[in-house]
């Protein structure tokens, strides 16, 4: 059964799907839930995990959402992101290795929502154009473009949940000489196939996960050399002999790149692994989240409630150690807030802002990686404790992350060959049948082969 309340969810990626599953879970227990409408601009669910060969614009002229590439494997252990209510073993019928390729993770994400039967709540190929809030009626007007029928229309909702992600709008810096660079210049968002760079000398600009993984992919598929450059600190791993880290890029002159230490090098391609922006071009200033990519997002009470309009929620806007299970914790909490099981009416704006400040202060208390992982783990625990989301061993998930960091430090090109224990089933993952550097086929069939 549904109440008269209407809820709009923006996006059917992992966060939006978590929200659909949360409402479906309540409905399955006999609770009355609001009418749910999820708008998704792509023709399928999965968000970033819904791979496309396209770059730039999609078939409808919308900016391509996908930032994933062929041969992408999870860069963190699956034991840190497993759904508490749907294990990898339940989905695949057996335990699988700890670092699955993209296609395997997409299949896992899809399996849970197929089981929950929530697809009818999603309007695919429907891009959100604008959202307004009317103070007099207390309703949001959501204007969308239905590409299937080439129709623009508006509907009203009591609540809006923004689950559109923040890893699809690239941050593209400019360096002197880019205009006359003679090689390939591409942002990680548009990187699709490492084989393109086989036999080439490449420069990777950046020192975070994209730089680490895209550089590693290019190494695996035969790049002649990799140079990566950093603005603040090197990644500092034990790189292969043909990979060197340099300080900040200063300028480019044709195919020569110059660094802040006075050195230079000839390269055939430059890959910008320079991050992404929180970008919401469908929201006015009074509804639009403005935050850096951090663990304690600005202006979000409990990390999800928009303090300037508590009828609006944001999911998954944090920098992330935990992913799918954190999105679940947030989605269950938002569901209960909307359904009145968590009472926001007596929380003042001042109290919400104080909550945000307290979270920021705690985040900034240390720059230690283990501290950051535990910080986000405590956040997940906090939300889970306030809802009926299935409890799971969050500390055990932290241990998987700690081991992952240790294994990366030991051998950055072999860390995916390790295995960890599921915190949901207690089963140790098998070691994958082929070492990562030799596993050139990333298909699900090849991965699941015994």
Curated annotation (Swiss-Prot):
It catalyses: trimethylamine + NADPH + O2 = trimethylamine N-oxide + NADP(+) + H2O. FAD binds at residues 15, 40, 42, 48-49, 65, 75, 128, 320, 323. Its EC number is 1.14.13.148. SUPFAM superfamilies: FAD/NAD(P)-binding domain. NADP(+) binds at residues 73, 75, 175, 207-208, 210, 231, 416. It comes from the Bacteria. Its cofactor is FAD. Keywords: FAD, Flavoprotein, Monooxygenase, NADP, Oxidoreductase. One of its GO terms (molecular function) is NADP binding. Belongs to the FMO family. Catalyzes the oxidation of trimethylamine (TMA) to produce trimethylamine N-oxide (TMAO). In vitro, has a broad substrate specificity, oxidizing many nitrogen- and sulfur-containing compounds, including dimethylamine (DMA), dimethylsulfide (DMS) and dimethylsulfoxide (DMSO). This is Trimethylamine monooxygenase. It comes from Ruegeria pomeroyi (strain ATCC 700808 / DSM 15171 / DSS-3). The gene is tmm.
